[in-house]
Amino acid sequence: MDSDIEMDMESDNDGEYDDDYDYYNTGEDCDVERLDPKRADPEYFEYECLTVEDIEKLLNERVEKLNTILQITPSLAKVLLLEHQWNNVAVVEKYRQDANALLVTARIKPPSVAVTDTASTSAAAASAQLLRLGSSGYKTTASATPQYRSQMCPVCASSQLGDKFYSLACGHSFCKDCWTIYFETQIFQGISTQIGCMAQMCNVRVPEDLVLTLVTRPVMRDKYQQFAFKDYVKSHPELRFCPGPNCQIIVQSSEISAKRAICKACHTGFCFRCGMDYHAPTDCQVIKKWLTKCADDSETANYISAHTKDCPKCHICIEKNGGCNHMQCFNCKHDFCWMCLGDWKTHGSEYYECSRYKDNPNIANESVHVQAREALKKYLHYYERWENHSKSLKLEQQTIDRLRQRINSKVMNGSGTWIDWQYLFNAAALLAKCRYTLQYTYPYAYYMEAGSRKNLFEYQQAQLEAEIENLSWKIERAETTDLGDLENQMDIAEKRRTTLLKDFFPVDA
């Protein structure tokens, strides 16, 4: 009997901590996570930062491998690889299944009249077709017509000898000068691998070696090769250009997911999957929709533009000059939340209500105008918080700059060294990382369907937001904050952040 009572009491005591314990203090698989960083860090991502020369070598190896198998020129090999995301295996398999269809799909040869003879679509037949084109995808008219016989160019209407004409697999023949002018015009417009035949309604692709044979000006040749290289990299799913200004680094990873890559040269961070600013936990498609909506809704800028609000107690105008949303009126010393203007003393228990949008349960029965107003109200709720955290990141950077100046003065006066004060900059860096994640939770919540999963997300979002504001408050008052207290707050905030990402970051989306 007594043992049963004791077990019940233990169970009840455990229940008091269910909310926090279940989400943040399970300690499950701790040993595994220490050994496997992928389990411990939801943002863990293996990648390499490579130079242009490194990537050229990598791509050339793929080209040479395909050349050996199919016995074609590097020019045609690049076309086939470009169309199949640089997957040699896929190209060879399709070549063996239906080589003719492969060449048509890659725009190396034009669609022909349907054939019933299966031999005509075999690899041998396709190879013979390529051999007739010199294995390159183009030929001079002189190869089929005596060089001394003249013909008329359908573009410039000039009559020239046959060796001055070039044609693709489609058979459309044009003089050398017209091809050259056409190529340079296309290159000037930024087109390279997608240059097609000059003939109307013909989409046969011009191979690289024909372009480089006829375009002799070094400037145009360099431009063509630069544009072609960009096309090759963009078509390769495991490669991504660093979006940093004037940066030449290319990131390579076999894990094609929406993880953060940081360039080793310019230190730009971005999403590897889409190349945009890193946006976890929101996936690539949703963030594109959100940013498009933000750009289109111009009235939002006017709504959000004000940097001032009135104190809810004494009504004096207050300007927000820091990143923390825990505000204290300089006049009456009233503590309140910048976002909802609620009393900060009770705000800790009500943070869930502050960050959470309350839908109108009867909205489906309302008029179109009421529904439109409700939709705008919902959007502004999320946008205001999204924009506020963006501004807070900038304001907190200003706080760090002021902090650096104060610490420099202390160091100059003999009050410790820079190493002694490094913990403050570590705290500021963690705060920026946490707030950045929090900012991108709002587009995620905006498009999330109502239900238990959204309720859980908003709960974790509110917990993260509360701990971020606590950390920001302590950093802004760093000189009076206990080191142990600050480090404890850093640990709590990071745990909230990683827990949310583990539960909701759609890395495979």
From Swiss-Prot:
Q: Where does Zn(2+) 5 bind?
A: 311, 314, 329, 332
Q: Where is this region: TRIAD supradomain?
A: 149-358
Q: Additional info? A: Overexpression does not rescue clustering of muscle nuceli in ari-1 mutants.
Q: Where does Zn(2+) 4 bind?
A: 271, 274, 279, 284
Keyword Heme appears in the UniProt entry: no
List the coiled-coil residues. Answer: 387-410, 452-503
- Tell me the protein's name: Potential E3 ubiquitin-protein ligase ariadne-2
Regarding protein family, the annotation reads: Belongs to the RBR family. Ariadne subfamily.
Q: Which compartments is it annotated to reside in? A: Nucleus
Q: Where are the zinc fingers (RING-type)?
A: 153-202, 311-340
EC number(s) for this protein?
A: 2.3.2.31
Any one GO molecular-function label of the UniProt entry: ubiquitin conjugating enzyme binding
Q: Acidic residues composition bias: which ranges?
A: 1-22
| Gene name as annotated | ari-2
Comment field on protein domains: Members of the RBR family are atypical E3 ligases. They interact with the E2 conjugating enzyme UBE2L3 and function like HECT-type E3 enzymes: they bind E2s via the first RING-type zinc finger, but require an obligate trans-thiolation step during the ubiquitin transfer, requiring a conserved active site Cys residue in the second RING-type zinc finger. The active site probably forms a thioester intermediate with ubiquitin taken from the active-site cysteine of the E2 before ultimately transferring it to a Lys residue on the substrate.
Q: Which GO terms describe its cellular component?
A: cytoplasm; nucleus; ubiquitin ligase complex
- Per its UniProt record, what InterPro entries does this chain match? Ariadne, BRcat_RBR_TRIAD1, E3_UB_ligase_RBR, IBR_dom, Rcat_RBR_TRIAD1, TRIAD_supradom, Znf_RING, Znf_RING/FYVE/PHD
Q: Active-site residues?
A: 324
**GO BP of this protein:** protein polyubiquitination; regulation of macromolecule metabolic process; ubiquitin-dependent protein catabolic process
Catalysed conversion reaction: [E2 ubiquitin-conjugating enzyme]-S-ubiquitinyl-L-cysteine + [acceptor protein]-L-lysine = [E2 ubiquitin-conjugating enzyme]-L-cysteine + [acceptor protein]-N(6)-ubiquitinyl-L-lysine
Record-listed Zn(2+) 1 binding positions: 153, 156, 175, 178
Q: Which SMART domains match?
A: IBR
Q: Where does Zn(2+) 6 bind?
A: 337, 340, 347, 354
CDD domains, from UniProt?
Answer: BRcat_RBR_TRIAD1, Rcat_RBR_TRIAD1, RING-HC_RBR_TRIAD1
Region (Disordered) location? 1-23
Q: Which organism is it from?
A: Drosophila melanogaster
Record's function text: Might act as an E3 ubiquitin-protein ligase, or as part of E3 complex, which accepts ubiquitin from specific E2 ubiquitin-conjugating enzymes and then transfers it to substrates.
Residues that bind Zn(2+) 3: 242, 247, 263, 266
